[in-house]
């Protein structure tokens, strides 16, 4: 998700009524509707109810949170399943311990009234991206699913300016846009977009946003309590989407705008109802996808990549 309308640092602290265990959670970006269960758990007192004082920190650099967890500088970080596979192969001691958003959000984004009606129309066109590696593999899979390859298009690094690059005509499409944000952002700005969903264009389904911990140092009991609180928060969100939006928006003035209201409505159905539960096949399939794409040298066992912390 690439937005610039909010501040890049945001911290919420619960006030302990009794002696509580302190936990540090690094977000993947500034606070936004993707983080709904976390903010609701904080605002509704669900963390305090399980004796946790959770410090929620947004990073100055979105690439830092997994590294900080690996280095023992944070207990948990929000990250992305595709990146986790690569980071483990790079030697970072990380493991998925929970899921926040249980579906892909990534999409191939084009102008709704533009010339790209199917991904096959990208032949000879420019496609913007912000992060190499996984996004290139995702794009390659989409192109091959539609009879093309990366050789048929021109890749343009637009950094984090995905929708601006598309709306300005710098590129004909962008990969890495989040369907719950960029589509709404473009519509609000009067330039409607259209998403080709990666899971419908040749990609295996995956968990977009996950929680990662250091398997060598993590406190399983504390993390289990954290997920008990966020699961309760997710149930509240699903049962009371409007009331929960009001609680979420009231937590910070920056959240009280049309973009976040729209994104909230689009994100609610995608939150993991059982954050600790995991699909072993999903992680095995994506590991195989990355290996086939040549991004990893060998296949790790799923037990290395992910775990259910509630299982003894």
Predicted regions and their residues:
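N-terminal signal peptide c-region/cleavage motif recognized by signal peptidases
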Residues: 14-16
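Conserved C-terminal helix/tail region of periplasmic/extracytoplasmic solute-binding proteins
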Residues: 284-312
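Secondary-structure end/capping motifs
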Residues: 219-295
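Pocket-lining segment of extracytoplasmic ligand-binding domains
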Residues: 82, 161-251
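Periplasmic-binding protein-like
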Residues: 100-110, 191-215, 227, 265-267, ...
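Short helix-capping segments at alpha-helix termini
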Residues: 46-49, 145-150, 189-191, 221, ...
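Sec-dependent signal peptide recognition
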Residues: 1-9
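Short, glycine-/small- and polar/acidic-enriched structural segments
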Residues: 21-158, 163-164, 168, 172-180, ...
């Amino acid at each position: 998700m690439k937005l610039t309308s909010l501040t890049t640092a945001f911290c919420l602290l619960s006030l302990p009524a009794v002696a509580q265990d302190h936990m540090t959670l690094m977000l993947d970006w500034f606070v936004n509707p993707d983080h709904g269960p976390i903010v609701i758990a904080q605002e509704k007192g669900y963390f305090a109810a399980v004796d946790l004082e959770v410090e929620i920190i947004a990073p100055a650099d979105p690439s830092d949170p997994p590294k900080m967890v690996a280095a023992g500088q944070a207990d948990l970080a929000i990250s992305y399943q595709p990146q986790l596979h690569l980071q483990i192969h790079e030697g970072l001691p990380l493991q998925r311990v929970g899921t926040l958003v249980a579906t892909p959000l990534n999409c191939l984004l084009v102008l709704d009234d533009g010339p790209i009606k199917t991904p096959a129309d990208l032949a000879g066109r420019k496609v913007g991206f912000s992060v190499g590696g996984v996004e290139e593999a995702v794009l390659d899979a989409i192109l091959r699913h539609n009879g093309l390859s990366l050789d048929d298009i021109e890749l343009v690094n637009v950094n984090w300016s995905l929708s601006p690059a598309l709306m300005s005509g710098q590129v004909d499409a962008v990969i890495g846009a989040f369907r719950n944000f960029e589509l709404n952002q473009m519509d609000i700005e009067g330039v409607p977009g259209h998403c080709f969903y990666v899971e419908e264009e040749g990609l295996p389904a995956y968990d977009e946003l996950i929680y990662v911990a250091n398997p060598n140092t993590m406190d399983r009991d504390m993390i289990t309590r954290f997920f008990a609180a966020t699961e309760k928060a997710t149930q509240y969100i699903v049962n009371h989407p409007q009331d929960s939006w009001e609680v979420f928006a009231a937590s910070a003035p920056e959240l009280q705008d049309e973009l976040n209201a729209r994104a909230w409505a689009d994100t609610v159905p995608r939150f993991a109802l059982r954050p600790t539960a995991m699909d072993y096949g999903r992680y095995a399939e994506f590991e195989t996808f990355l290996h086939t794409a040549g991004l990893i040298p060998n296949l790790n066992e799923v037990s290395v990549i992910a775990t259910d912390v509630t299982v003894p």
